[in-house]
Amino acid sequence: MNENGLSYIDLFAGAGGLSEGFIQSGYRPIAHVEMNEYASQTIETRIAYYYLKGNGKIKSYYEYQKGQITRKQLLELIPKEELKTVINKEMSEATIKGIFNAIDDIKEEKGVNQVDVIIGGP
């Protein structure tokens, strides 16, 4: 999945459509910033999909799709470091410093020195 090793941040991420294309092209997501709670939850679900698929545990994702496990049970299978890449906050003067700090923390935890691309929805 990480063929080219390039990293990105997704601003105004929505439900993650742009991220889907970047992930499928081998980019590594650093953070997804989205103010809508439900769109952020969709991104978390996609993170779960890619994590489980990449770790040979895709069966758990299919169990979730079939209603055999709850969303909470699904997300408990995913490392917190992966899920915290979803920053569910509105970007404003009041929140921007906290968002930058959260992104810096994620970069440090992932050992990322630079972000290669910043993408954003309309």
Each PLM stretch: what is its role?
Residues 1-122:
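Conserved active-site and SAM-binding loop architecture
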